[in-house]
């Protein structure tokens, strides 16, 4: 029977050691809570970091970019500019479309922003054109955020107009109702309509004008209230045949009488069922299709939203005819799931490697089982807390848990090693557990809180990066806290019940061989340490040189923002000459599609031509290239992009810009490339002067590639210069001229056909098949005040001019965006510096301001705060350690280990060819928390030896280094192996995880080698400094 130690031993662990059943059940409760939490947690690619973003779209068919800017965009912008919480407002006014994107502060709820936007639209309504076909429509979606799912709807038996009608009424509306869906857009522009194509010669011969026809149609098709009759006994509702709903009915419409004979619409026009906008088209691979893009609301869970869509699709497709086929072309969640699965596999691999290293050191199965239980328990228990904090299972939280594997095992190792040491000395297991746990308790607390102190600055990081790493930091901190609890409760209890002198002494051939190897290593370390202690100044110079080297490496290492991920989807923009027509652009798009689909890595392609609010002009096309799964293709996305661009370069007259889609989207506009730089001025003239000059210089920089600008000011314009005096003499107003032109060439929506399920438009235009180009203007006729018909050419001259194809604003001022990529042999930091240097050489006028946008702006912000972030982490750790040790000196000794970690991490990143990006910086901050553990374990035991055994500082630190060498080596290798799977990851999302692993492995290797020697020397140096300081104070007191 064991004699129980005094109740004073064991510290906080005593209660749990003495009550094994209660401790076991408590741990089971943590385990069950974690399992339940894991099942309840949503899955996503990254933590929720979206800015509240709302897009406002206004369509005004036929309006020029200048008219859209002045008549639609500007009135709306003035109202939006008064909203509180607005961070940035950008707009794009192109032919027939105005798109305004409103980005709000992160702290503003999206519902509040929505209310403000609706109020602003209402306030601007009276200032908008009276003939606007539809009011502005807003959606809670970021236009730069790629769709979560893309579907193609095709049919071999039905026209596309019928297909779109069915998709819009039966499919799109239902998907829009799913929680998390922000916007469902149909690309292809085949909305059904009745198209009236006037024969200009026929109406001229009859003395009619297009305005006569328009008035007749609008008056003949109405759908308004007619009232009801209320008699003594019956009530009767009034109805009439006031609506015409088919092309045949419109053909029979009488528009005028001449000589008593009716003139019907079919006599002067071709009336047919067609598409509302004939200048829109979409293709799935090579087949014309209706392409449905589903975008999520900011803040919505992408996985659950996509799952809901897939669950509904079978039901929706059953409601369509069998000749209509619905195909899922892309689903972003496929790669997100694969990335999360790969990270989970790496987490399990890290746990296995850590357990293996424990067995290698302890060489005892019972002693290995204890941390083998503590590690997964600490990690699983973290899931329960994540649920309460509304976190998700994503790449960053799983990376935090993977890294935590090496952290949480440290506590268990330290406890087991200390208890085992007393058992090997002959103590009973229970007494050894109480004594060892009590002795090591303060060390565990020091390790835990000093490590959490490193994470505190991450929680105070501002803007998007702070939001991004909030879940990472808190998840890691929670895992570390749970680990500390488990190490002070379950671990000593299990040691007391599972360890014994017999089990620890039981050895096999492997145990004996490894024991001899460790003894030789420790002996060699002891001899080396003795020599180092005899030459302290040489060692100190090595420590100082690592500090200098870390600063130099920090300055010269290439810097980036966020790793470019391979998500299997490429966004593309196809650019043709500015005067390209829709037909010409559609032909070029088909040529490019043929080339792209021949690439072995491409699975499918969707493409779109036309102006719809997202695509700004007819001379550009949007592409989405869906690649095969990563395990089915030989190359990653960047190589595929380079290969596709080389192939498309052979197609004449087009430029192709490609970029891989990313899980982290900071931009608010669809861009041609990954990075953006803007020039903002007070006038378009200033931009037209300086944009070409800057573009010329930027295109010569080797640090940039794919440099392009959205400044397109060579769009052809037929300027109708009206002789106002002549027009006035004939009684013709400018409104009459505009109406005539709009009727002829604007695809004017002149009337609405109402049905039980939907509403369709009547479109008026001239039939220009026989009079293409500018010749069509010669067919325009106007009505004079005396009823005569006047040719437009008699009162106006037609001049050809150039004008912008689109007008862009940023915070209500004209802006041009320059897009660029960064070549493989340069970093984003190099590109940013090169652009800034080039800008200085131009001496831009004061009325032109420049700014980086999107992730480039976030990179500048993150780079500026990085140094302060690291300083804050060091200061936070110093404060915590100073409080724990009640000393100003010992924390400095502990923190002296940090430069070695920085040198190792930066060297490893440079050797691996990785940039110092946000992920790598987080790894360096974590290293600050890891490497100081070595110093803490040494200093704790040295101080105890000085205090309890009366040893000299040199003997105490020497003994502490030898006693703690094995747990120091064990914990460092455990942390290293925990990060190793991240460094070696090759699956989906590996680009995101690898920099963290590389930095941590490199930092741990270098710091492990150096701190074992530098820490004791610095400890003794500061001890002498403390003695000298005390003696100086004592002398001053005696003199006083």
From Swiss-Prot:
Q: From the UniProt record, list the coiled-coil ranges.
A: none
Which UniProt key words apply to this protein? Cell inner membrane, Cell membrane, Membrane, Transmembrane, Transmembrane helix, Transport
Q: List all membrane-crossing ranges.
A: 16-36, 347-367, 369-389, 396-416, 440-460, 472-492, 537-557, 863-883, 888-908, 911-931, 968-988, 998-1018
Q: Does the keyword Cell membrane apply?
A: yes
Question: How does this chain sit within the bilayer?
Answer: Multi-pass membrane protein
Query: What is one Pfam family matched by this protein?
Result: ACR_tran
Top-rank taxon, per record: Bacteria
**MF terms (GO), sorted A to Z:** xenobiotic transmembrane transporter activity
Which cell locations does it reside in? Cell inner membrane
Q: Which GO terms describe its cellular component?
A: plasma membrane
Q: Tell me, how does this one assemble? A: Part of a tripartite efflux system composed of MdtA, MdtB and MdtC. MdtB forms a heteromultimer with MdtC.
Report the sequence similarity comment from the record: Belongs to the resistance-nodulation-cell division (RND) (TC 2.A.6) family. MdtB subfamily.
The protein depicted here goes by the name Multidrug resistance protein MdtB
Q: What is the lineage of its organism?
A: Bacteria, Pseudomonadati, Pseudomonadota, Gammaproteobacteria, Enterobacterales
